[in-house]
Amino acid sequence: MDMENFIDIDSSVSFDTQDFIHFVRGRRSHRRFLEKDVPRKDLETLVDLCRYAPTGSNRQTLEIMIIQDRGKIERLSNYTVDFFENEIDSLAREAEAYREAGMEVPQIITSALTMTDTLNLIVTARKFGLEVIFHRAPVVMIFHSPVETSCPKDDCVIASTTVTLAARTINLETCYIGLFEFAANTYQPIVEELNLPEGHKVYSVLILGYPELQFYRTVDRKPMRVQYL
């Protein structure tokens, strides 16, 4: 450990609570970015900040892969669409097999089938030259961790959420890409392309860049259901 990193904590808070709430509410999911590279120093700042995000049992086992190579991003996008195209056909065949056998289609399959319209749109979009996985973002951040650790999913999501907020302080915006997270842990071509350390899985994925659009309003949310006991 570097003892110089044990810095004094200032107990005073330099920002107002309402200002912080407004800042958090101002975070929006961005899917359109300028064709502008993100400086390495800014990425390093965000990565370094993740060191201080809490982890289960203080294990600190999560790792980050940052992809800026446009060719690699395009390959991963195409692999993801391939995966879901295969999944659509596979789910339909499985459901039909259950029906032909006079059996009830399992809930896990019927639930997955509700996503087929969305997945078909993704497949169709590619045919028209659209990139709807990473949205042509200049940076893809993949948060991965050993499966055999205290709280791998929590660790990665806490770190990625920290990035979504900190990025806004340097004029960057983000969006979570859950579709890729699912495919990355299932589809062999993606597994091989990422070549994660043995025993690791992807638990959170962000795209990041300078936003092309500016939002002028926050959005409303459902009231939080809470119990005070």
Labelled PLM ranges:
Residues S11-V13, L196-L229:
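C-terminal helix-cap and adjacent tail motif
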Residues I66-C151:
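Glycine/small-residue-rich phosphate/adenosyl-binding loop
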